[in-house]
C-alpha cells in the first residue's frame, strides 16, 4: 500500500499507554512514500486527529472536503507516531495543500526544524 503525504486514513491506534491517542480515528500520513518503501518494516509516520479544538500551531484546523473528513477536525501534531500499515482500516482522501502546509509548519515547530527555530549561525570572525 503506497500512501502519499497528506492522505487521511482511518487507523486503530489501540493499544496505547499514558496520554497517547487510542481507538479508531482518522490520521494524516506524514511520511514520504519513497522513503517508507525502502524501509525494513512496513511503517507509516502519522499524526492523529480529533474533533476537539486545540490552540496554536500544533493543532491546525482541518475542514471537511476532499480529505474525506465530514466535520471540522484538528491535527494532534504532538501525538506524532509510527504505526504498522496493517493498522489502516480505510483510506479517505487527501488534505488540501494549505492544510498540509499547516501540518508541516506544526511538525517543523514540534521537531525543531525551520528558520524560526534554527537561525543561521553567525560566522566566526578572527
Where in this protein do the model-derived segments appear?
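Conserved functional hotspots at enzyme active or ligand-binding sites that engage polyanionic ligands
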Residues: 1-126
Amino acid at each position: 500500500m503506497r500512501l502519499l503525504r497528506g492522505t487521511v486514513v482511518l487507523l486503530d491506534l489501540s493499544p496505547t499507554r499514558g496520554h497517547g491517542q487510542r481507538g479508531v480515528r482518522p490520521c494524516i500520513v506524514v511520511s514520504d512514500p519513497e522513503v517508507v518503501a525502502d524501509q525494513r518494516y512496513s511503517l507509516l509516520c502519522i499524526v492523529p486527529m480529533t474533533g476537539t479544538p486545540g490552540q496554536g500551531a500544533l493543532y491546525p484546523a482541518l475542514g471537511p472536503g476532499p480529505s474525506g473528513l465530514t466535520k471540522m477536525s484538528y491535527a494532534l501534531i504532538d501525538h506524532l507516531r509510527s504505526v504498522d500499515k496493517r493498522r489502516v482500516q480505510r483510506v479517505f482522501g487527501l488534505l488540501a495543500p494549505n492544510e498540509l502546509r499547516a501540518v508541516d509548519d506544526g511538525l517543523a515547530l514540534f521537531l525543531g526544524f525551520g528558520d524560526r527555530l534554527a537561525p543561521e549561525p553567525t560566522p566566526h570572525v578572527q
